Amino acid sequence: MASIDFRNKINWHRRYRSPQGVKTEHEILRIFESDRGRIINSPAIRRLQQKTQVFPLERNAAVRTRLTHSMEVQQVGRYIAKEILSRLKEQNRLEEYGLDALTGPFESIVEMACLMHDIGNPPFGHFGEAAINDWFRQRLHPEDAESQPLTHDRCVVSSLRLQEGEENLNDIRRKVRQDICHFEGNAQGIRLVHTLMRMNLTWAQVGGILKYTRPAWWRGPVPDSHRYLMKKPGYYLSEEKYIARLRKELQLAPYSRFPLTWIMEAADDISYCVADLEDAVEKRIFSVEQLYHHLYHAWGHHEKDSLFELVVGNAWEKSRANTLSRSTEDQFFMYLRVNTLNKLVPYAAQRFIDNLPQIFAGAFNQALLEDASGFSRLLELYKNVAVEHVFSHPDVEQLELQGYRVISGLLDIYQPLLSLSLNDFRELVEKERLKRFPIESRLFQKLSTRHRLAYVEVVSKLPTDSAEYPVLEYYYRCRLIQDYISGMTDLYAWDEYRRLMAVEQ
């Protein structure tokens, strides 16, 4: 296996207007400080304050949003990164791995990847994702793209329907239909950063949020060697060329991951498991005492000095003693969080170091906290209790169903833009209003200028005399609608749906 040299991975160049020449340690750090500023000040980060973590449309400010969750992930990611660097320093391996002058950028990339990790999520979280994908599947039927004879194809869009004697074009149609019907928050995050917001981040910083390496248009089985890394779509057809360049700049083999992404993933796993349980107590879904009993019984066999006793049991006993006369709830979660971090962060850091050859190559086919250890079992305990007692709660399920209906309803409302012919839509884009299409004109005016410009820019570069043009134009039109609706906050989507459905406020 090739030698480990992080100078080949922490690439501080950018796609546009990249810094030139050899840089000192301080100059490289300033480049990544610029990334921090671009990210923290971006509208995509601000919108996270009104996007769901677990409880949609929550008015209680003590319950987490995507933004407060992401800030917590950022802190845990920083903790893991510092732990890794500290251990490598103790082993005198920083210089060997090319990290002696890159500790600052190493930490910064991890922190900002953590802060950005959810920016592509649509309103209402995973139910928003499901609503988008279900809506498009009902119209494009990507599963029929493999059907024989071609007359069985139920796709309602004529330009995307398979045709006899057009095998090359049919391959593109299959690819486009598969891609459109696999909206995914991580892939949308890549699209936001590069295509929609043009943040022009360093290659290394963008590599930190490429969590999954399967393209959204992938059909068929994935290789066993990358089964975990490719379990979800990681980027769209619209960003295919950009990702190809990213791989080249970061020296990533096909379907491999950037090394620091494993740290971001571990920080997310640690953060949300405890946070979801704390939010459930805040929402009075169960009490701290009930939560402790749920955790106790779900753990199974108990032994003295087990990981459960050292983490959960210790937090429970200290909160009950409550010598400071503080809230039992606050005390329990403070101790639970501290105990969990003190056990899992060092373990995640050591797992990173122990598996560094595979991680550096981007081929480590599992999460840092996904193994047969007690630490992994502890995380699974938190997740299982949340699934059984939080996510299945009637109040949560009702809000999720409402969110699903809101997103589906908004897509129904904007569907006329997808029904226009190529020539009619092109004319609408050029003139912005057409008398013969009053509804479509008003809907088009409501779309974000940023999203409309992204559509115009890419479609204007397509050769109009090519047989592929109608297929690709429709693809980017679908992206335009998905970009707009997925970029809404929960509250904006809810209000927009009610306004357009003429429901009383």
From Swiss-Prot:
Coiled coil: none
HD domain sequence ranges: 66-273
UniProt GO molecular function: dGTPase activity; magnesium ion binding
Keyword Hydrolase attributed: yes
Reactions accelerated catalytically: dGTP + H2O = 2'-deoxyguanosine + triphosphate + H(+)
Biological processes annotated in GO: dGTP catabolic process
InterPro entries: dGTP_triP_hydro_central_sf, dGTPase, dGTPase-like, dNTPase_1, HD/PDEase_dom, HD_domain
Alphabetized UniProt keyword annotations: Hydrolase, Magnesium
Oligomer status and interactors: Homotetramer.
Role summary: dGTPase preferentially hydrolyzes dGTP over the other canonical NTPs.
Family membership noted in the UniProt record: Belongs to the dGTPase family. Type 1 subfamily.
Name of the featured protein: Deoxyguanosinetriphosphate triphosphohydrolase
Species annotation: Salmonella gallinarum (strain 287/91 / NCTC 13346)
Lineage of producing organism: Bacteria, Pseudomonadati, Pseudomonadota, Gammaproteobacteria, Enterobacterales
